[in-house]
Amino acid sequence: MSDNEDNFDGDDFDDVEEDEGLDDLENAEEEGQVNVEILPSGERPQANQKRITTPYMTKYERARVLGTRALQIAMCAPVMVELEGETDPLLIAMKELKARKIPIIIRRYLPDGSYEDWGVDELIITD
């Protein structure tokens, strides 16, 4: 038992000031301003009709995809390519990327708040 447990009476939280930012959120709901659109469970977001971003995978996207996939493989996720003695998760992720078998979707946000979703298999990968 520590010394702090003996002196705790539960009333120590009374002197904490309430956050005034919460009042703004409550007032926004009362004014009828809704910033969130909830889709029904059967309805999916609209697919990209015309994409305006480049079809090339950037070096930052490549690094993020390889790191994320290597972490998944290290945590025993199923591997999407045939292994030929590889044990390093990063090397396996690189092999999956080269074979375009990584099951990850890249979401690119645009300045107007919209976004484009690209599958790894849709992007052009340069080395």
Curated annotation (Swiss-Prot):
One Pfam family of this chain: RNA_pol_Rpb6
Start and end residues of each stretch annotated as Disordered: 1-52
Assembly mode: Component of the RNA polymerase I (Pol I), RNA polymerase II (Pol II) and RNA polymerase III (Pol III) complexes consisting of at least 13, 12 and 17 subunits, respectively. Pol I complex consists of a ten-subunit catalytic core composed of POLR1A/RPA1, POLR1B/RPA2, POLR1C/RPAC1, POLR1D/RPAC2, POLR1H/RPA12, POLR2E/RPABC1, POLR2F/RPABC2, POLR2H/RPABC3, POLR2K/RPABC4 and POLR2L/RPABC5; a mobile stalk subunit POLR1F/RPA43 protruding from the core and additional subunits homologous to general transcription factors POLR1E/RPA49 and POLR1G/RPA34.
UniProt function note: DNA-dependent RNA polymerase catalyzes the transcription of DNA into RNA using the four ribonucleoside triphosphates as substrates. Common component of RNA polymerases I, II, and III which synthesize ribosomal RNA precursors, mRNA precursors and many functional non-coding RNAs, and small RNAs, such as 5S rRNA and tRNAs, respectively. Pol II is the central component of the basal RNA polymerase II transcription machinery. Pols are composed of mobile elements that move relative to each other.
Keyword Transcription: yes
Entry keywords, A to Z: Acetylation, DNA-directed RNA polymerase, Nucleus, Phosphoprotein, Transcription
Cellular compartments per GO CC: nucleus; RNA polymerase I complex; RNA polymerase II, core complex; RNA polymerase III complex
Lineage, uppermost ranks: Eukaryota, Metazoa, Chordata, Craniata, Vertebrata
Lineage top rank: taxon: Eukaryota
Protein name according to UniProt: DNA-directed RNA polymerases I, II, and III subunit RPABC2
Alphabetized GO MF terms: DNA binding; DNA-directed RNA polymerase activity
Matches recorded under InterPro entries: DNA-dir_RNA_polK_14-18kDa_CS, Pol_omega/Rpo6/RPB6, RPB6, RPB6/omega-like_sf, Rpo6/Rpb6
Positions bearing N-acetylserine: S2
Family: Belongs to the archaeal Rpo6/eukaryotic RPB6 RNA polymerase subunit family.
NCBIfam families registered for this protein in UniProt: PRK01099.1-3
Organism: Bos taurus (Bovine)
GO biological process: transcription by RNA polymerase I; transcription by RNA polymerase II; tRNA transcription by RNA polymerase III
PROSITE patterns attached to this UniProt entry: RNA_POL_K_14KD (PS01111)
Main location: nucleus
Cell compartment(s), UniProt: Nucleus; Nucleus, Nucleolus
Biased composition (Acidic residues): 1-32
Residues with PTM Phosphoserine: S2
